[in-house]
């Protein structure tokens, strides 16, 4: 995956042999893991400029931004607070259903190519489309769910709203789109392609510690057992979409590509150095697993001050338990 690129550090210098060895050790660790999945995000200079006031023409500064703040969903650019998926009240569930139905209807009336695709989706998923418009009928089933399952339902419905891409919701979306397919990522925007990963629990066991929220729009199994409306397939299944809540944290970024250059997250080198210091096989395995599930260690001591240089109106923190939104 990386062999086709000219590999550079965050200062735009070619990697030393030692750094190359560390990068490929990290890559091999991630590619052979059952606990993580590679993701890709195509990005445009226009979108980068809207966030950071810089783009791919100044990779040194862009690296500083991406490897400090990551990339944020538009909820962080907007004044509006949006809908909170952690609110598992019945009222919030009905609000989500009503909003999603409205976004689908508005998408159908858009008159563009996306509207045609949404129409195909609604015809194929008629049962879901009809059900989501009748949220009141599913209140009983929702109220019987455990709070954690309710939260996943909220995340799932809001991810569908994000994918449909209604103009109103798109401007305050609490997600960013990524894909498991690098070719697809470059189709969406080809000025830059961010490489990263998301945690993956192949055994579907409950984790001791919560990790970042995301929705794999092609996986419906968890929704099928709730008794609530769900889609038999993704809105746009060919996109192989992973919708990540709030944004892609720098802790889960490997680097980003601009044409034939690939800029590496410097936290990777620190992670491999730390791993080499661990003598015990068991401790080393636990350390690798921690990176795969919870990301790299990033020095964000001056994070809030750094964010003042961006166009973000808000930023979020995730402490392993809760997502918290902070105003600038």
Where are these regions (language model features)?
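NAD-dependent ADP-ribosyltransferases
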Residues: 1-328
């Amino acid at each position: 995956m990386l062999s086709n690129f000219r590999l550079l550090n965050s200062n735009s210098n070619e990697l030393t042999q030692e750094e190359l060895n560390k990068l490929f050790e990290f890559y091999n660790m991630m590619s052979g893991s059952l606990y993580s999945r590679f993701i890709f995000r195509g990005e445009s200079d226009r979108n980068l400029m809207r966030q950071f006031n810089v783009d791919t023409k100044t990779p040194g500064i862009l690296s500083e931004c991406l490897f400090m703040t990551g990339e944020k969903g538009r909820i962080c650019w907007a004044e509006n607070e949006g809908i909170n998926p952690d609110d598992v009240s019945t009222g919030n569930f009905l609000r989500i259903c009503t909003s999603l139905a409205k976004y689908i209807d508005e998408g159908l009336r858009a008159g563009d190519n996306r509207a045609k695709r949404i129409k195909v989706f609604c015809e194929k998923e008629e049962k879901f489309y009809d059900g989501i418009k009748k949220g009141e009928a599913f209140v009983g089933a929702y109220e019987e769910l455990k709070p954690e399952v309710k939260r996943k339902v909220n995340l799932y419905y809001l991810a569908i709203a994000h994918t449909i891409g209604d103009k109103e919701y798109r401007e305050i979306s609490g997600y960013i789109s990524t894909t498991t397919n690098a070719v697809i990522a470059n189709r969406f925007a080809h000025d830059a392609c961010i490489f990263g990963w998301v945690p993956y629990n192949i055994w579907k066991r409950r984790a001791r510690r919560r990790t970042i929220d995301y929705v794999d729009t092609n996986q419906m199994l968890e929704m099928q057992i709730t008794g609530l409306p769900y889609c038999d397939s993704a809105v746009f299944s060919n996109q192989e979409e992973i919708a990540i809540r709030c944004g892609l944290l720098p802790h889960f970024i490997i680097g980003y590509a601009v044409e034939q250059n690939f800029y590496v997250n410097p936290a990777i080198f620190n992670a491999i150095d730390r791993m080499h210091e661990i003598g015990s096989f068991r401790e080393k395995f636990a350390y690798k697993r921690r990176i795969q599930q919870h990301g790299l260690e990033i020095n964000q001591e001056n994070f809030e001050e750094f964010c003042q240089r961006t166009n973000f109106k808000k930023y979020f923190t995730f402490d392993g338990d809760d997502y918290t939104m902070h105003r600038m």
